[in-house]
Amino acid sequence: MTVWMRIRAALPWLVVGALASLVVIVALLPAAWVTPQFSRATGGHVNLVDPDGSLWHGSATLLLAPGSDRSASTLLPGRIEWRTAFWPLFTGRVQMRMRQTQAMPDAITINASLRGATVSAGAMAVPASLLVGLGTPFNTLDLQGDVRIGWSDWRLFGQDVFGQLTMTINDVSSRISIVKPLGSYRAVWQAQGANSTLDLSTLKGPLFLEGHGTFAGHASSFTGTARADDAQRENLAGLLNLLGHPIGPGTVSLTF
């Protein structure tokens, strides 16, 4: 057997060995390499901090911030934990199971490849005070209450995203209002490719919020109303003035 024939016979095994080494290297990347990707993708609003472990098996803490300035950020109690499956890496896919020890004990599955990514349906419960870290208007309102978030399967293909997320806030109160609770509310985010919509509705008052928003690329708009129950109109007058411009008795417009 000539040298070239030997090289030709060994080449497939060399390629397999190189690919296996690359997969192992990627899988053993430290968690500190993974976490900055979340910050860049969300403009600094959603961050994974205090990472531990690796891409293979690691954990981190969720931090919400108004942007690059983290001085007013908030932390979600508990840890986000993930495990990456080994064999899918050989087919060019990343398959990861992720859970949050306190807010989301039931794990979700993330599948990603060069063609796109999917996130399985899930749900989590967080305190409304966590939203303060997102900045205005949440830091001004300083909301208290229980937030429950549920979502369908989400699919990402290039710049197009498909899925639905529903957030329900029960018995909301605010430090700037003597009326407690203000009410319970539901917001539904529907992603439809390059466009998405947001619908806000009230489950119970005395503060009633309604609105609809559209988002397409860098363009976005939201219009709605905030209205006080007649019995609490006087007590809610100050909060209504902060939320929008008066358009009627005990009613203001919401425009963002």
Set out the residue ranges of the language-model regions.
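Alpha-helical transmembrane signal-anchor/signal-peptide segments
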Residues: 31-50
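Hydrophobic membrane-insertion alpha-helices, especially the h-region
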Residues: 8-30
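N-terminal beta-strand/beta-hairpin edge segment
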Residues: 46-139, 152
